[in-house]
Amino acid sequence: MTLARYKRTTAGLVASCLLPWLVSCAPPRLDEPVIGAKNFTEQVVLGELLAQEIEARAHLKVERRFYLAGSYIAQQSMLAGRIDMYVEYTGTALTAILKKPPLHLADAAQNEAASLAEVTKLYQQRFQIAAMQPLGFENTFAMIVRPDETASGPGLGMAGVDTLSEAVGKAQNWRLGVGYEFEERPDGLRGLEKAYGLHFKGEPRTMDLGLLYRALASHQVDIIAGNSTDGPIAAEHLKVLADDRHYFPPYQAVPLVREAALKRWPQLRGVFAELAGKVTANDMRAMNEAVDGEHKDVAVVVRGFRAAHGL
């Protein structure tokens, strides 16, 4: 076991032991909807979008509990009644929470529909949590490179590579950078390597997601596992290699809401219906970049999006 993996394993064990204490020791909640979000920019933006829409349309005061440390903490907070809702991604819900294998239907639309149906059914049966209609975009994993061989350095053979299949036989010269979660997840690195027969140069460099793009720009790595709605992709004109074998499952952004909360505040359903299909992948990239790249306040960015879309 490498030192990095030992640290991650130890951290995971500590987090597992502390989780009940962390959830139970959260501050007591008030009689108002509590909105959660995981600890990265897109999640905070989406949490703020839910909050502003509920305040404006349902005329309810809401509590924001953002920066939860990952899907597992968010899910446990839902089950404990510490939060009432947050936005999750269908592929993450299916594989990381429900522990189901990804669906790999040949037709992309059927795959999206089947994954959403499975998540909707099992969340209701197991957790009494309702999956609302998708917001309109998915945030899948994305294998990202600098846009041309010149920028990538000599001898890497990236010119003309547009898909992951075309990377086979060349990637052994590429240094890979990944986030901690991607290396360990069932729908992450090891499965990707197996699905395509990919081999990279040496061990992957693991780091916080926010550092991946810096490492790519400074030539510390040659390819990274990012997210398809990351702001730097468009802002820095980076190239996403197409997942032409459809390895990654759909990751539609879907609000998850405790059924108890929907019974307590039935007007919430109208809010989620109004948001359905309103956020495109380009919208999400632009908001992420506005916060991360332009250092704008999340609430201001969300208000601008709502105004531009008549929300």
Where does each model-flagged region fall?
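A conserved helix-loop-strand patch within extracytoplasmic ligand-binding domains
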Residues: N111-R175, G277-A281
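Ligand-binding cleft/hinge of the Venus flytrap
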Residues: L50-A58, E149-T150, G157, S165-K201, ...
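Ligand-binding "clamshell"
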Residues: I97-A109, S115-M132, S218-I223, P232-H246
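Ligand-binding pocket segment of bilobal, Venus flytrap-like solute-binding proteins
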Residues: A171-D243
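Short helix-initiation/N-cap motifs at beta->coil->alpha
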Residues: E63-Q76, G202-R214
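C-terminal motif of bacterial Sec signal peptides marking the signal peptidase cleavage site
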Residues: W21-S24
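Periplasmic-binding protein-like
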Residues: Q125-I129, L135-A142, T206, T229-A276
